[in-house]
Regions:
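Residue-level signature of catalytic and energy-coupling elements of molecular machines
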Residues: 18, 80, 117
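C-terminal cap/substrate-recognition subdomain and adjoining C-terminal extension
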Residues: 1-3, 9, 89-174
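Metal-dependent phosphoesterase signature
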Residues: 63-98
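Short, compositionally biased "basic patch" segments
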Residues: 51-77, 128-140
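A general structural signal for well-ordered alpha-helical segments in protein cores
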Residues: 26-27, 64, 162
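Active-site neighborhood of HAD-like aspartate-dependent phosphohydrolases
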Residues: 2-56
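Conserved alpha/beta cores of soluble small-molecule-handling proteins
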Residues: 38-39, 58, 77-79, 97-98, ...
Length: 174
């Protein structure tokens, strides 16, 4: 999504999951980075919420932090970050070709390009570094080289996306 500007520079905002990337990258990262045994063991602990989510009675913005905490709480950052590098490279090959070209066109025109996503920074920051674009997403908390299982920012979905965009960018500039 972008708005054409009369001031010669545009703010081009791209969503990730289901848009620039055709799949759910967060769930994909869980299966990429963690053992099946760990996923099953931790998944059983939050099974009622998973079921409620799939029955559309528990919202995604509540499910994501619960799932993140169950899967990554106490995980070693160096191990997960190495897997995130590999996963980011994998996702780069999965980008929607037409939208990726739009992104490149915006960069070529000198526009400010931003990825705005409810997914987590662990792998999205690496993707944005590779694409040389800015990132607004859900941050993850690290203490003593371990993921705490908590977010360092609110879940970046719905109204939070709008709030975070307006917080970081002066829309009058575009």
């Amino acid at each position: 999504m972008y708005a054409t500007s009369k001031k010669n520079i545009n703010l081009a905002l791209f969503d990730f999951d289901g848009t620039l990337c055709k799949k759910d990258s967060f769930t994909g990262f869980i299966f990429y980075a963690l053992s099946k045994r760990h996923i099953v063991k931790q998944g059983l602990k939050i099974l009622p919420w998973i079921q409620a989510y799939y029955l559309n009675i528990y919202p995604a913005n509540s499910m994501r932090p619960k799932l993140y905490r169950a899967m990554f709480s106490g995980a070693d950052t160096s191990e997960i970050q190495q897997l995130a590098k590999e996963y980011a490279q994998h996702l780069m090959s999965q980008l929607d070709p037409q939208l990726y070209q739009q992104l490149l066109d915006h960069q070529e025109q000198g526009d400010d390009v931003v990825l705005v996503s409810a997914s987590i920074d662990i792998y999205l920051q690496l993707i944005c570094d590779l694409l040389n674009i800015d990132l607004i997403c859900t941050g993850t908390e690290i203490i003593h080289h371990q993921f705490t299982g908590n977010y360092s920012t609110p879940d970046c979905s719905s109204e939070q996306k709008k709030y975070r965009i307006l917080e970081r960018y002066n829309i009058d500039k575009y």
